[in-house]
UniProtKB/Swiss-Prot annotation:
The gene is gmhA. Homotetramer. It comes from Glaesserella parasuis serovar 5 (strain SH0165). Keywords: Carbohydrate metabolism, Cytoplasm, Isomerase, Metal-binding, Zinc. This is Phosphoheptose isomerase. Its EC number is 5.3.1.28.
Amino acid sequence: MYQQQILIELQEAQQVLNDFINDQHNLKLIQEAALLITDSFKNGGKILSCGNGGSHCDAMHFAEELTGRYRENRPGYPAIAISDPSHLSCVSNDFGYEYVFSRYVEAIGQKGDILFCLSTSGNSKNVINAIIAAKAKGMKIIAMTGKDGGKIAELADIEIRVPHFRYADRIQEIHIKVIHILMMLIEFEMAK
């Protein structure tokens, strides 16, 4: 009944992954991001992560695997997803949704920390505001984007882009794969 559509979906997902892999620069950027994160951890820094919708879930997933575990039993790493419902509703109500992440960064971000942000469009205003706040604090920015990278591309210290223009879910599928690779590399590097 739907097997042909299922096959088409899987083949499209495979093509997006193949396109991403075939750009060797992406592999270099993933390694650079992992090393930047571990350098921050080794120097007392932390990760703040943010995104909207499915990207918000990916930001929480990344923080959870840093504080909890990925594949190895090891000490937790300092990471916070900007996802506290009372903070999000307070700032949305009092200042506007475009400030939900930046207010949190202003409150607890410090020099040496990293803002890990996700935006499939690269143009999410609240993520851009968080980047601006993080830069003002002396934080480094790792951004995972899609399409042409949007405005975020020029603001990030490291931008990992999935250049897919059709569906956000295809971009998010690569984002979560990259997050898992980052976790693997972080665990390798922190074990040294």
